[in-house]
Amino acid sequence: MNVSVMEKPGKQAEGKARPVLEVKNIETFYGAVMAIRGVSLEVHEGKIVTILGANGAGKTTLLKTISGVMDPEKGKILLDGKEIQGRDPDVIVRRGVAHVPEGREVFPFLTVEENLRMGAFTRNDKEVGSDIEMVYGYFPILRERRRQQAGYLSGGQQQMLAIGRGLMTRPRVLLLDEPSLGLSPILVQEIFGIIRRLNEEQGVTMMLVEQNANVALRTADYGYVMEIGRIVMGGSSQELLASEDIQEFYLGVQGESQRGQKRWKRRKTWR
């Protein structure tokens, strides 16, 4: 299968260069409730970072704060060293952050190809067509359905379309919220295989919130654990997979997330 290649930014060495995305001591409120409590993290170029946590931990709120859907009360968010917090979402998209929210949001009455072109609304160049072909290369079923209204696609196909539309912005960072939600195990493996290929072949930097901790950690390079709006643990994916706490609470026998099904009896106190 021939897949065209998007123009890649130069590689950066972790620890020697500024991260693409920096979140510094962010606090975000839902009404009077503090949903994000002093969160700080980094995403380096060409890496996949995953965020793990139970329901209500603040993962989705964090992505919404980064993408401008919600405004932080405190802290900074930097993209390539420039502050973006508090900006309108369309401005943040133009700066290079694409957000694929949970729930497979597509424009149901537009065709597949029209949905992809909507993803390129911030662009005014002649390479939109070649980028659509790139998306079709990774998601061949979308090429077959390109003239079909998106509302008639299956759940897995809609998820592929949502990811493809996010790619059409040529993002510096692609935010993915629960891409496996509601999908069969076979489709989950297929989509995460494509996510890894997009990272390796196209150099797409990603921040991934995912309920399936096993597949997320085996796809990502680095991970953070959130609890009640705070970052309580961080490390390479290999380190997190080896953690007894992660194994006990998140990784079941079949690799399914155990969040919310039992109480987290930690062997140690988070630092």
Residue ranges with predicted function:
Residues 2-271:
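Glycine-rich phosphate-binding loops of nucleotide-dependent enzymes
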